[in-house]
UniProtKB/Swiss-Prot annotation:
Cofactor, free-text remark: Reduced FMN (FMNH(2)).
NCBIfam families attached to this UniProt entry: aroC (TIGR00033), PRK05382.1 (NF003793)
The protein's name: Chorismate synthase
GO molecular function, one term: chorismate synthase activity
Length: 363
């Protein structure tokens, strides 16, 4: 199973949705970084369930425990183990799903591949696995902030066909956190919330798009060919549950332009830095960051587990009907915002360490 992510900043998540707990081991964190559970908890609180009526009603405090790798408030350079214990588990809600497959969920493919699966809340396929990613992302984020002043802000850009108008170059984190939708366009956020409320009452679900901007990105992150920065960013965010699409910069809209229209022309600013007049490249050229803002978008499908009756089959292949029980998000987007930020932070931190290891030696 692919439970480890990264090269120098390596992250291994563990645990199941309704098991004893979930967590992460971070290997490769530089020593002497000031780190406490408070640094991690503030990000976990943004991800936790039960925040509002738009999220799953499961009630978890998601209190984190640092088990190793930190001494007297600073990292040791040794593996950092972080644990979050599960408290509000109801495995009995999923008893029917031990035999019946949820449409568009991981149930059938897990059974086909492994011949066994944890059917209680989806086990490793549950979004609860992302607790470890968000915890590790908090550490990566702190490294990026201290080394380069890097700022990562994600927000809900679109819910179904309702799209927000947001300037990624100026959007503030406070505006994102100002409403339960995590959409900085307040008027559009109200429309999104109303739509999610309607879908929730129908025991249905809905998807959309999250946009993410990264500011103060060091020049030179990423490598040509197989380790291009945008390729690793795509892998990171596309590994999140329910993700179905990725684009960076102009993305698919760039296919409608000519080269003359699409190219980002260069100039030298007052500080002598090479800049681009536009940013259709999304901050990455040739697989390497150019110092401009990185702007990417991630598409998330509607939550697969819904309360409406659907046609499916059981493990024996017999056709049946399933109206799923359990507690689930009618829309994953508000809680996926910190997940996207975490994966972007993990990718950038790993590439930052790799860049320093390869390109910053003096001979």
């Amino acid at each position: 199973m692919g439970n480890t992510f990264g090269h120098l900043f390596r992250v291994t998540t563990f645990g199941e949705s309704h098991g004893g707990g979930v967590g992460v081991v971070v290997d490769g964190c530089p020593p002497r970084l000031e780190l406490s559970e408070v640094d991690i908890q503030k990000e976990l609180d943004r991800r936790r369930p039960g925040q509002s009526r738009l999220t799953t009603p499961r009630q978890e405090s998601d209190r984190c425990e640092i088990l190793s790798g930190v001494f007297e408030g600073k990292t040791l350079g040794t593996p950092i183990a972080i644990l979050v214990r599960n408290k509000d588990t109801r495995p009995e809600d999923y008893a029917e799903m031990a035999q019946v497959y949820r449409p568009s969920h991981a149930d059938a493919t897990y059974d086909a591949k492994y011949g066994i699966r944890n059917w209680q809340g989806g086990g490793r396929s549950s979004a609860r696995e992302t607790i470890g990613r968000v915890a590790a992302g908090a550490i990566a984020r702190k490294i990026l902030t201290q080394v380069a002043g890097t700022e990562i802000i994600a927000y809900v850009k679109r819910v179904k066909d309702i799209e927000a108008v947001v300037d990624p170059d100026t959007v503030a984190a406070a505006a994102v956190e100002a409403n339960i939708m995590r959409c900085p366009d307040a008027a559009t956020a109200e429309k999104m919330i109303a739509l999610v409320d309607e879908v929730r009452r129908q025991a249905n679900s809905i998807g959309g798009v999250i946009e993410c901007v990264v500011r103060n990105v060091p020049v030179g992150l990423g490598s040509p060919v197989f380790d291009k920065l945008e390729a690793d960013l795509a892998k990171g965010v596309m590994s999140l549950p329910a993700s179905k699409g990725f684009e960076i910069g102009s993305g698919f809209a760039g296919t409608l332009l000519t080269g003359q229209e699409h190219n980002d022309e260069f100039y030298t600013d007052a500080q002598g830095r090479i800049r681009t007049r536009t940013n259709r490249s999304g901050g990455v050229q040739g697989g390497i960051s150019n110092g401009e803002n990185i702007i990417l978008r991630v598409a998330f499908k509607p939550t697969a587990t819904i309360g409406q009756a659907q046609k499916t089959v059981n493990r024996a292949g017999e056709e049946t009907i399933l109206a799923a029980k359990g507690r689930h998000d009618p829309c994953v987007l508000p809680r996926a915002v910190p997940m996207v930020e975490a994966m972007v932070a993990l990718v950038l931190c790993d590439h930052l360490l790799r860049d320093h290891a390869q390109c910053h030696l003096n001979f």
